[in-house]
Amino acid sequence: MITRAELLDMLASNAPQGFEAQALGLVPIVVETSGRGERSYDIYSRLLKERLVFMVGEVNDQTANLVVAQLLFLESENPDKDISLYINSPGGSVSAGMAIYDTMQFIKPDVSTLCMGLAASMGAFLLASGAKGKRFALPNSRVMIHQPLGGARGQASDIEIQAREILYLKERLNNLLAQHTGQDVERIARDTDRDNFMSSDDAKAYGLIDQVLLKRP
C-alpha cells in the first residue's frame, strides 16, 4: 500500500515544468489514515463514498455511462440511502440524457439534484427530474430550457424520418417536463420554443427546482 511520503514523492517526480499552468488539469488526491495504514483516492472516488455523483460538461454517451454506473453501484451499496447528483452542464445528447433519466427513475434510492453553475438543455431536464422536494440550485446558478436540437441531410425520405423522430422527442420531453414541474404541456411547449434562461429563483417559481440553497442545511 502506498504511503503518504511515497505518494508525494511520486507526484513531485512526475510534475512537469510550468506546473502552475498545468495544475488545473490534475485531479486532487486525498490520503486517508486509519489503523490499517494510509489509502489514497482521487477526489471524485472519495466523494462517491459519500454518495455524491458529478455530471459536469457535455452530456454524451461517455458521461451517461459513468453516471449510470455510479448510480447503479450506489444502489447496490445501500438501496435505502439518497444519492446526490451535482450538475454543471450545458446539455448535450438526448439519448444519453434519457439513459441517465431512466436510471434515476429506475433505481430504488431517491436521487437529489443540485445545480452549481449551469444546467442547460438536457442538464436542466435532469435537474428537474430529481426526487420531488430534493431538487436544489445554488443562488448564482443559471438554468436554461429549450426544445431539442437536430439536423438531417440526405434523401427527402431520410430527412422526413429524422423530422418525425425529433418531433416525437420534443413531445416526449415536454410531457415529462410538465410532469416534473407541474406546468401544463402547452406552456412548456411555448416556453421551450427558444432558449429560455432563468435564475435559480425563477427556476424555483417554474417548478424546475424546489429550493435555492444559500448554505448547507
UniProtKB/Swiss-Prot annotation:
The keyword Membrane does not apply. Keywords: Cytoplasm, Hydrolase, Protease, Serine protease. Pfam families: CLP_protease. It comes from the Bacteria. GO terms for cellular component: cytoplasm; endopeptidase Clp complex. It catalyses: Hydrolysis of proteins to small peptides in the presence of ATP and magnesium. alpha-casein is the usual test substrate. In the absence of ATP, only oligopeptides shorter than five residues are hydrolyzed (such as succinyl-Leu-Tyr-|-NHMec, and Leu-Tyr-Leu-|-Tyr-Trp, in which cleavage of the -Tyr-|-Leu- and -Tyr-|-Trp bonds also occurs). Its main location: cytoplasm. GO terms for biological process: protein quality control for misfolded or incompletely synthesized proteins. It is found in: Cytoplasm. Its EC number is 3.4.21.92. The active site is at residues 121, 146. Fourteen ClpP subunits assemble into 2 heptameric rings which stack back to back to give a disk-like structure with a central cavity, resembling the structure of eukaryotic proteasomes. PANTHER family: ATP-DEPENDENT CLP PROTEASE PROTEOLYTIC SUBUNIT. Belongs to the peptidase S14 family. This is ATP-dependent Clp protease proteolytic subunit. It comes from Burkholderia vietnamiensis (strain G4 / LMG 22486) (Burkholderia cepacia (strain R1808)).
